[in-house]
Regions:
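Classical protein tyrosine phosphatase
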Residues: 230-254, 504-543, 660-662
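Cytosolic, low-complexity regulatory segments enriched in Ser/Pro/Gly with interspersed Lys/Arg
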Residues: 2-50, 54, 114-127, 156-160
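Amphipathic regulatory helices of Ca2+-sensor modules
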Residues: 63-83, 107-113
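Primarily EF-hand calcium-binding motifs
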Residues: 47-62, 85-110
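Reductase modules of NAD(P)H-dependent flavoproteins
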Residues: 341, 432, 450, 455-459, ...
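EF-hand and EF-hand-like Ca2+-sensor regions
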Residues: 74-75, 91-163
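Ferredoxin-reductase
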Residues: 394-477, 547
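Membrane-embedded alpha-helical bundles of multi-pass integral membrane proteins
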Residues: 132-384
Length: 674
């Protein structure tokens, strides 16, 4: 190991105040002037000298080319970057040219211990005008304005449940059976009425074709939060659980014991006719058709609910060994089909009620018939449509991180909006599994494309099959079927003039389609000359955060294309963040940062992503990013679209709420749900 990069690593764990300040350079890139080539070059010279100043030199205080190259290779390895020998040699020559241009020789004595703060624009510290600070509203108003569509739907649902419960409660409060069972009876029957209602509407949020069709209506889409369909499905499921506990629990612990132990005189005078004038025992009622169907429904729903829980579906490895064997996405998917049996049992259960003599009182079928017909119609439509789509694979490519890119023919009549997704099936892996993937092609493209990252059993099998076929140069690639398109949150970007698109890892896929669509709009005749796209979009900010350098290969060609087509119009701004690199200002990344800035200034290509989009280090400082947007777009409405893990999603949603309270700019948050 040379003395140069030995000293580099020995000094890499010491910090100065000035160096840490430079970490703010990438935190608010949206306000950086694009014409900063001279500043970059000057700052990169300082960064190179700071990084190399920690290296020992020979007696003449010279750095050799070998020393610099080894320092570059070590710094690259320290930051988990892939760097070839040829690239290291190129960057070494770049440094030598820069030093020779700056001083005429490679002596570094007397070099200023500066930082990269030359790049920091003064507008970062520009305060928000006082008149806008005075426009802050109360937290309640801001919350209501951001969530009013969710609020009214939830309120209407709660009102409907409460009204049905109260109506049935009061009805059975007047029955003769009340004398035997007391308030247990109306409580159980009130809960049963809410169960009928919730068992009906729980199907509607998963009728994806119907939702996609309704999204086309601006008036309907403006008042119904279709993006929250899965959340509402879960909310109604929670209502079903509460209803089961009240209905089943009250029957088993209160109603049935009171019937079995009722005074024979009171029993004969009140409800004997409902039981064939025979007072049943506890077990006789439990083992009756009504009892067994009810218990069977509870058991099946319990299995489905447990296998649909987040630990079971997303992280089965954290579960006990016995449960782990049956957990995962497949268990969730197949167990949900138990509800076919549940609905059959529900109808049977409702036809053998003890205390309901008239057919008019057996109303369960009235609640569920329309939702069940819609759902079954959707399933039939999906089967027919997927069989009619003749989509052939034109090209398949594998990327680092076990990502598979598929480019397919576009079926006739297949129309979609950017941000939508499709379900994909690979019959050679499973004839029954369909998985959702965002389209990464634009609506105007003559093909369809998707990117599949291996995150589960199905995707691993699909990746391995294609990887093996490509390795053997086999022209007979595995076949896939598609179903869709389906609406998603990202397609609502067209509602805004300014959008902020945030993707983590493979979560960038829906926004790649959006960016390509915007670039296509910029090319269309009718695109205005005042930096607007054809659909009225004025500005799109795209933030992509990933852990591995190889991830940039997934969309490298697309980002180059989008950057070139956007050109000088400046409608699209893209920012890549690589979290494996130490933050800017850290000595461990200073040499890489300096080379990156110098290479970008000379060639316009980022050395990390190999695209015209500069890569920033570590993670974005989201509060600074949002504050920068608020200052730049005072009084405007910004659509924030996010696809990635829930933890950051909650953080960004809270940040939007906070910014809406503290600034005059309104941030509207949208998150992808599959």
């Amino acid at each position: 190991m040379s003395a140069c990069y030995l000293h580099l690593v020995m000094s890499s764990y010491s910090y100065s105040v000035g160096e840490n300040e430079s970490a703010s350079l990438a935190e608010e890139p949206i306000l950086v002037n694009q014409n900063i080539t001279r500043s970059i070059s000057r700052s990169s010279s300082h960064g190179i000298r700071i990084a190399l100043d920690s290296c020992e030199r020979n007696s003449s205080s010279h750095l050799t080319e070998k020393d610099i190259k080894q320092a570059i290779m070590f710094s690259s390895s320290l930051n988990k970057l892939s760097l070839s020998q040829d690239e290291a040699t190129e960057y070494t020559h770049l440094i030598l040219e820069e030093i020779q241009t700056g001083q005429g020789l490679t002596k570094l004595s007397g070099t200023r211990k500066g930082t990269l703060n030359d790049l920091q624009p003064t507008c970062w510290s520009t305060p928000i005008p006082t008149k806008h600070i005075q426009c802050m509203t109360s937290a309640a108003i801001v919350f209501f304005r951001a969530h009013w569509r969710r609020i009214w739907v939830i309120v209407m649902w709660l009102v409907a449940c409460a009204a049905l419960f109260t109506w049935k409660f009061m009805q059975y409060r007047q029955r003769l059976a009340f004398e035997v069972m007391g308030y247990c009876l109306p409580t159980a029957k009130g809960a049963a009425e809410t169960l009928k209602f919730n068992m009906a509407i729980v199907l509607l949020p998963v009728c994806r074709n119907t939702i996609t069709w309704l999204r086309r209506s601006r008036s309907i889409n403006s008042v119904i939060p279709f993006n929250d369909n899965i959340n509402f499905h879960k909310l109604v499921a929670a209502g079903i659980v509460i209803g089961i506990i009240l209905h089943g629990g009250t029957h088993l612990s209160c109603d049935i014991p009171r019937i079995a132990m009722a005074d024979k005189t009171i029993f004969g005078r009140t409800i004997a006719g409902d039981f064939g004038y025979h007072q049943p025992s506890y077990m006789e009622i439990v083992t009756s058709i009504e009892g067994t169907t009810g218990i069977a429904m509870v058991v099946l729903m319990l299995i489905a609910f447990l296998l649909a829980s987040r630990p079971s579906r997303r992280n089965p490895g954290s579960l006990p060994p016995l449960v782990r064997q049956i957990a995962g996405f497949n268990a969730f998917w197949y167990s949900h089909h138990l509800f076919v049996v549940v609905y059959v049992l529900l109808i049977v259960h409702s036809m053998f009620l003890y205390l309901a003599k008239d057919v008019s009182e057996k109303t369960t079928w009235v609640y569920v018939v329309i939702p069940v017909m819609i759902y079954l119609g959707e399933r039939m439509f999906r089967i027919i449509r997927s069989m009619s789509y003749d989509s052939k694979i034109l090209d398949a490519t594998t990327y680092p991180g076990k990502v598979l890119s598929l480019r397919m023919t576009k079926p006739p009549g297949f129309r979609y909006q950017s941000g939508m997704y499709v379900f994909v099936q690979c019959p050679q892996v499973s004839k029954f599994e369909w998985h959702p993937f965002s389209l990464t092609s634009a609506p105007d493209d003559d093909h369809l494309s998707i990117h599949i990252r291996s995150l589960g059993d199905w995707s691993y099998h699909v990746y391995d099959m294609f990887h093996e076929a490509l390795r053997r140069s086999n022209l007979d690639l595995p076949k896939v079927s598609i179903d869709g398109p389906y609406g998603a949150a990202s397609q609502d970007h067209s509602k805004y003039e300014i959008v902020l698109l945030i993707g983590l890892g493979i979560g960038a896929t829906p926004f790649i389609s959006v960016l390509k669509d915007i670039a296509n709009d910029l090319d269309k005749e009718g695109c205005t000359t005042n930096h607007h796209s054809a659909n009225g979009l004025r500005k799109a900010y795209f933030y992509w955060v990933t852990r591995e350098q190889g991830s940039f290969e997934w969309f490298r060609d697309i980002m180059k294309e989008v950057s070139a087509r956007d050109g000088k119009q400046g409608v699209i701004e893209m920012y890549n963040y690589l979290t494996s690199i130490y933050q800017e200002g850290d000595k461990r990344s200073m040499l890489i940062s300096a080379i990156q800035a110098l290479h970008f200034a000379r060639h316009g290509i980022d050395i990390i992503s190999k695209t015209p989009v500069r890569t920033h280090f570590s993670r974005p400082n989201w509060p600074r990013v949002f504050h920068g947007l608020a200052r730049k777009h005072i009084g405007e409405r910004i659509g924030v679209f996010y696809c990635g893990p829930d933890d950051l999603g909650r953080q960004l949603e809270r940040l939007c709420h906070k910014m809406n309270m503290r600034t005059f700019t309104r941030f509207v948050f949208h998150k992808e749900h599959f």
